[in-house]
Amino acid sequence: MEIILLLFLLQIKHCYADFVIQTYKQTVHKGIYRDPIGISHSVDHVWTSMIALLVFSFFYAINPFTIIWLCFAEGILHYHIDFVKVKFGSKDQTKPIFWAQFGLDQLAHQVTYLVMAIFLLNL
């Protein structure tokens, strides 16, 4: 049951960071490596992951340092997944390849959350 709660919290935070608070500028600048505006989107994922894991830690003990480094690792990975998609992916939303690449991007993020959950539940 723990994994369901953890994945649920990570899904909520992902939806919020990717689809609610992400700005147009962030979507464009994610394709410029080390651009502060593009990086800010990944920072949004770091702090929303921290909140999700802090909520989870009310029910299941997690070392605070583990939360910090795991969230920063997720932010770095999120940044690079998005960079590759924006830099090398299709920009034309009318083409099926755009949506296939968008789906692969989202799958990569979901696999990241699954790995995070498996790691945390096997400490």
Set out the residue ranges of the language-model regions.
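Hydrophobic alpha-helical transmembrane segments
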Residues: M1-S90, T94-K95, W99-L123
